[in-house]
Amino acid sequence: MHITSIAIVFFAAMGAVASPIATESDDLDARDVQLSKFGGECSLKHNTCTYLKGGKNHVVNCGSAANKKCKSDRHHCEYDEHHKRVDCQTPV
């Protein structure tokens, strides 16, 4: 009976040691995704989104489909650097 008690405690301890622990890196990945979005302004003439990153202006092309083009000149747009996507029809 004594050996079974030790075995139960031993297996319980092994389960506790082997169970995964949530790390902070999961939270950091989610934070990095949020920090990778940059707001900018649309150019209706060129159908581009110009946003400021690191003190420099970056220009990306908006989509050519009707639901991806700029709505109006100087309309707010958003570039997601993590997913490499631009949204030129972002509501203000």
UniProtKB/Swiss-Prot annotation:
Organism superkingdom: Eukaryota
InterPro entries: Antifungal-protein_dom_sf (IPR023112), Antifungal_prot (IPR022706)
Keyword Signal: yes
SUPFAM superfamilies membership: Antifungal protein (AGAFP)
Gene3D superfamilies hit by this protein: Antifungal protein domain
Assigned GO CC terms: extracellular region; host cell cytoplasm
UniProt-recorded name of the protein: Antifungal protein B
Species assigned in the record: Penicillium rubens (strain ATCC 28089 / DSM 1075 / NRRL 1951 / Wisconsin 54-1255)
Name of the gene encoding the protein in the UniProt record: pafB
